[in-house]
């Protein structure tokens, strides 16, 4: 089918926006120009002068299916991603059953094939059942379609296990993706160790819990040559360790989540589970280090860590609520409003971190508006300001601390392989 997206604007170098129309055909971008004859197309969509970007790429989401479908499903999670402008997402393996064999992984892909409205790439675990010290069969999992290997939700606690996993992943040319958390340093913590945790009388999580395991893993990554990717970096020390590793030529990449760029522990209003996440919100110096890390290339990309939970679960106290907040439907709006509108980031940088770079570092055919590339496209309204309304989410979950925040940059349309996956007009 020949599809036209007309009257849009795309980013050129030096952050210039130019008028553009996109000709989509056979699932790819066939041509980009100022305008085309509408009579030549079977479908025409009007961008009304708004921003056209490559579809965003999120390398860190939790879709909860199978096993926890009262929180989220592949269908609702992928719709949430599409509503946020994401066309490719990578789903974590903390499921039930854990997809730790080729057969179980194939079953998850069957669900994805049936229900997903965006491209969903599934991670496989590093160890059986996530918490064991028994390595999975990485070769078989790769053949079954594993995107990369991770035990996200828990850190691999034993250095020897991590070393062997890295060695195997390197041999298979696969990435090893790490949730970094030394459990021996947790001490039951539920939020950042600092003045706020003391004020609320809650056990804190040391910054060293994260940075110490990153330092260990980087040493092992140097030894094995694996592509080592650090999930949701949150501390100043972690940024320093990653920066030093990159300077030393070690193949390490890293992501940061929007909430860690925007919020700090001082923003937490009280003992409210909607503010509980892992890693926790850190201090002002940590947040600035994350911003600086993006700007100097230490941190490669922005990933949401979309983590849906049931409402009753998150309405509990910090001690009892599960970790995590949703982020797919708010990520671009929050980053655009808080950083581009304020002049801290450029629009080009944001698209780089949310589309181009995540695709590049994992070798995905995504994140680009070029002739012949997959027609994975988002259209954003940069002009209209509106409050975030969790009740309007496509996600089953509403666990966000950003409800009521006024933001710009809502998604108007999302296309996957040239087909309309989500549009505001259709809602």
Curated annotation (Swiss-Prot):
SUPFAM superfamilies: Composite domain of metallo-dependent hydrolases, Metallo-dependent hydrolases. It catalyses: (S)-dihydroorotate + H2O = N-carbamoyl-L-aspartate + H(+). Zn(2+) 1 binds at residues 60, 62, 152, 305. The keyword Heme does not apply. InterPro entries: Amidohydro-rel, DHOase, DHOase/Allantoinase_Hydrolase, Dihydroorotase_CS, Metal-dep_hydrolase_composite, Metal_Hydrolase. Substrate binds at residues 62-64, 94, 278, 309, 323-324. It comes from the Bacteria. The keyword Metal-binding applies. Binds 2 Zn(2+) ions per subunit. Catalyzes the reversible cyclization of carbamoyl aspartate to dihydroorotate. PANTHER family: ALLANTOINASE (PTHR43668:SF2). Belongs to the metallo-dependent hydrolases superfamily. DHOase family. Class I DHOase subfamily. This is Dihydroorotase. It comes from Enterococcus faecalis (strain ATCC 700802 / V583). The lineage of its organism: Bacteria, Bacillati, Bacillota, Bacilli, Lactobacillales. The gene is pyrC.
């Amino acid at each position: 089918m020949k599809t036209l997206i007309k009257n849009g604007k795309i980013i050129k170098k030096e952050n210039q926006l130019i008028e553009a129309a996109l000709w989509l055909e056979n699932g790819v971008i066939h041509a980009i120009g100022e305008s085309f004859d509408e009579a030549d197309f079977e479908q025409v969509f009007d961008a009304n002068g708004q921003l056209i970007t490559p579809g965003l790429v999120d390398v860190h989401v939790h879709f909860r299916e199978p096993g926890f479908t009262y929180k989220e499903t592949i269908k609702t999670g992928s719709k949430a991603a599409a509503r946020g402008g994401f066309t490719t997402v990578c789903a974590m393996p903390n499921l039930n059953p854990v997809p730790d064999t080729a057969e179980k992984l194939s079953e998850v892909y069957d669900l994805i094939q049936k229900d997903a409205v965006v491209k969903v790439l599934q991670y496989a675990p590093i160890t059986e059942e996530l918490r064991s010290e028994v390595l999975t069969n990485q070769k078989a999992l790769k053949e079954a379609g594993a995107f990369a290997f991770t035990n996200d939700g828990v850190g691999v606690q034993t250095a020897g296990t991590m070393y062997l996993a890295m060695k195997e992943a390197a041999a298979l040319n696969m990435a090893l993706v790490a949730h970094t958390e030394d459990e021996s340093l947790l001490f039951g913590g539920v939020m950042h160790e600092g003045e706020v945790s003391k004020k609320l009388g809650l056990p804190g999580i040391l910054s060293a819990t994260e940075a110490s395991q990153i330092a260990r893993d980087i040493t092992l990554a140097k030894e094995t040559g694996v592509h080592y990717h650090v999930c949701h970096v949150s501390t100043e020390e972690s940024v320093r360790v990653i920066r030093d590793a990159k300077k030393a030529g070690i193949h390490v990449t890293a992501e940061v989540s929007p909430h860690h760029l925007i919020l700090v522990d001082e923003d937490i209003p009280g003992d409210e589970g909607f503010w509980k996440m892992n890693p926790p919100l850190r201090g002002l110096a940590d947040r600035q280090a994350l911003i600086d890390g993006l700007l100097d290339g230490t941190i490669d990309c922005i990933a949401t860590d979309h983590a849906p939970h049931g409402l009753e679960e998150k309405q509990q106290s910090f001690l009892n609520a599960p970790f995590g907040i949703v982020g797919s439907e708010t990520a671009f709006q929050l980053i655009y409003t808080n950083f581009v509108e304020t002049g801290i980031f450029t629009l080009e940088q944001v698209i780089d971190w949310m589309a181009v770079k995540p695709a590049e570092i994992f070798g995905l055919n995504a994140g680009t508006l070029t002739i012949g590339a997959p027609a994975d496209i988002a259209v954003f309204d940069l002009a209209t300001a509106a409050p975030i309304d969790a009740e309007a989410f496509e996600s089953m979950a509403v666990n966000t601390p950003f409800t009521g925040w006024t933001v710009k940059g809502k998604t108007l349309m999302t296309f996957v392989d040239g087909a309309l996956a989500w549009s505001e007009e259709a809602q």
